[in-house]
Regions:
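Active-site region of glycoside hydrolase catalytic domains
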Residues: 1-119, 130-150
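Alpha-helical scaffold elements lining the catalytic groove of polysaccharide deacetylases
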Residues: 123-125
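C-terminal/domain-terminus segments
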Residues: 141-167
């Protein structure tokens, strides 16, 4: 079972943890050994796995979705109105460029703006994924990347470089 895909609002973190506990208890009454999957708030962000309470159940997997940097992976996406619908975004590119361009997209761009990485590329990707790995280790659970990718509007060569870095 995956409990719910992409809980969004940050203020729902506590309520999400309560719902997880109640739902896991209910599932365990009818399916003791079935693996249960859930992720953090803000679209299953790597940054929010650390907000999940440590599970009391051993058949739990944490999931995360990886679309960072969102500015690149979601460029020209009609469902993200704060991202330019006309400008090509390249990968990799200077970190300052990404930070400046990520500011207008609000908390969906915060991941880039708050990153410690000095370069946009493998250093940034590693920093992001290691946050998920650390959260899962601290919780004693297996980690699963449930979604990742790049929109078909991105330059093809840059998309291939992104996939190489994520690999």
């Amino acid at each position: 079972f995956e409990l719910l895909n992409e809980v969004v609002e940050q203020e729902n973190a506590e309520a999400w943890n309560l719902l997880i506990a109640e739902t896991v208890d209910a599932i365990r009454r009818i399916a003791r050994d079935t693996i249960i999957i859930y992720g953090g708030i803000q679209w299953n962000s790597v940054k929010t796995l650390k907000l999940l309470e440590k599970p009391k159940d051993e058949n739990i997997l944490f999931t995360f979705h990886f679309y960072e940097p969102l500015l690149f992976t979601h460029q020209k996406a009609h469902w993200v109105p704060t991202i330019s619908q006309t400008e090509d975004i390249y990968y990799p590119e200077a970190m300052d460029y990404y930070r400046t361009k990520s500011l207008p997209i609000g908390y969906q761009g915060e991941v880039v703006c708050k990153a410690q990485s000095q370069t946009m590329g493998t250093e940034f990707i590693t920093e992001m994924v290691m946050e998920a790995v650390t959260a899962a280790k601290n919780a004693g659970v297996t980690l699963y990347c449930g979604e990742f990718g790049v929109i078909d509007q991105a330059p093809v060569e840059d998309t291939l470089r992104w996939f190489t870095d994520v690999d």
